[in-house]
């Protein structure tokens, strides 16, 4: 590579490590634990925790490899990296039937892999005595896969609003599917029709939401996320702007769902979309009617899943550095005037919904970052 003029620097890196985890909420998860009670001078033992003598550590194996590079006399630099983290013997408190006499049992339920690529680029587009223009861009592509589950789980495990299946993401939603409204404006949900052997033979609609079938309805994880920006310095002026983005993935808009109630909760506010609800004069609507007796109108379903794509303007800065000849008489070596704005704007699927949250269902009480505008002076003596 010494004879390759356009390569300034090329560095290969690789790392591997393993880490254990025993965080399952009990220091003695391998032991049955009892409480002793004394009532009317009679002693009794009651099972307070069901242990698992076969439980072991959860172990994560992390592997990273990639390149750092600098090309064309420093005009293009960056990093390309592949990462993989395989977690084996995953810890989980498996819920049990009430007839077992205990609520759950700790166990190692399988293995999971997180892997992806990261790209970070920095470019020097123009550099003269009076003008410098730089750009940067980064992205991360990330995929989660459940490799295997304990044989006792028969290939899948349900936990709340999620379903864990071998070969699929652990962030897969497991919700009822909304089927619009019936002829009276009552919310409907899909339900599988099964034969005597339990095989699915068809599908029907039902207004009894708790008995509707739940389905895998989308992955929370985005396909790609990252940021980009640019900076420009010319004739004493400096300008910079940075963006963040996310593509792919879905989130549950809990705030919107709560504002689309059918009137069962007195004193609760409504979203303006409730004006489009079904009425005798608006039978083409797919929004349930307003009725204090319709408790399943905004039931947990894919109706309130929304794309988590977004583009945000994170910051904008504009400044001007006065010529030295102007400030030299004040015994100042440098004076810069600037204004900046942070959290400028967010563009997403639904107004009022901020997808910049953790990979869980959206909460109704999450506040977006506050927009801030400031200005100032920078002095050097």
Please place each PLM-identified region on the residue numbering.
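Extracellular/periplasmic, surface-exposed regions of secreted and cell-surface proteins
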Residues: 1-168, 235, 300, 305-381
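Short, surface-exposed secondary-structure junctions/capping segments
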Residues: 110-112, 166-172, 266-273
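Conserved small-residue
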Residues: 107, 124-220, 260
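Short, hydrophobic/aromatic alpha-helical segments in well-folded domains
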Residues: 66, 210-213, 225-227
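Surface-exposed, low-complexity loop segments enriched in small/polar and acidic residues
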Residues: 97-101, 158-163, 175, 212-213, ...
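Extracytoplasmic gating/loop element in the C-terminal half of outer-membrane beta-barrel translocons
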Residues: 246-337
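Glycine-rich, aromatic-lined ligand/substrate-binding cores of catalytic
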Residues: 219-253
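A short local loop/turn or secondary-structure capping micro-motif enriched for an aromatic residue
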Residues: 87-88, 197-199, 248-250, 355-357
């Amino acid at each position: 590579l010494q004879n390759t003029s356009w390569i300034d620097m090329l560095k290969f890196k690789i790392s591997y490590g393993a880490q254990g985890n025993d965080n399952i909420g009990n220091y003695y998860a391998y032991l049955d634990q009892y409480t002793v009670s004394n009532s009317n001078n009679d002693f009794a033992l009651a099972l307070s925790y069901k242990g698992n003598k076969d439980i072991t550590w959860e172990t994560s194996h992390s592997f990273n490899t990639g390149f750092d590079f600098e090309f064309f006399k420093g005009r293009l630099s960056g990093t390309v990296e592949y990462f993989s983290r395989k977690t084996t013997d995953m810890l989980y408190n498996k819920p049990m039937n009430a007839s077992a006499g205990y609520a759950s049992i700790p166990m190692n339920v399988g293995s999971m892999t997180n892997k992806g690529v990261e790209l970070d680029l920095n470019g020097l587009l123009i550099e003269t005595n009076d003008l410098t223009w730089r750009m940067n861009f980064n992205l991360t592509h990330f995929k989660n896969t459940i490799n295997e589950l304990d044989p006792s789980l028969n290939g899948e495990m349900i936990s709340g609003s999620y379903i864990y299946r071998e070969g699929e993401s652990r962030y897969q939603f497991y919700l009822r599917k909304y089927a619009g409204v019936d002829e009276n404006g009552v919310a409907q949900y899909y339900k599988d029709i099964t034969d005597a052997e339990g095989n699915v033979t068809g599908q029907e609609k039902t207004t009894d939401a708790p008995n509707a079938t739940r389905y895998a309805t989308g992955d929370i994880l985005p396909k790609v996320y990252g940021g980009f920006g640019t900076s420009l310095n010319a004739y004493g002026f400096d300008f910079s702007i940075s963006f963040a983005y996310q593509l792919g993935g879905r989130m549950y808009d809990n705030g919107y769902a709560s504002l689309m109630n059918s009137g069962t909760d007195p004193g609760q506010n409504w979203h303006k979309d409730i004006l489009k609800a079904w009425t005798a004069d608006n039978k083409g609507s797919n929004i349930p009617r307003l009725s204090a007796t319709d408790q399943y109108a905004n039931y947990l379903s894919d109706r309130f899943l929304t794309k988590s794509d977004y583009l945000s303007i994170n910051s904008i800065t504009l400044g001007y550095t006065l010529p030295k000849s102007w400030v030299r008489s004040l015994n100042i070596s440098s004076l810069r005037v600037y204004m900046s704005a942070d959290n400028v704007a967010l563009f997403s699927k639904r107004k009022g919904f901020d997808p910049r949250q953790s990979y869980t269902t959206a909460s109704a009480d999450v506040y977006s970052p506050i927009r801030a505008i400031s200005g100032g002076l920078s002095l050097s003596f």
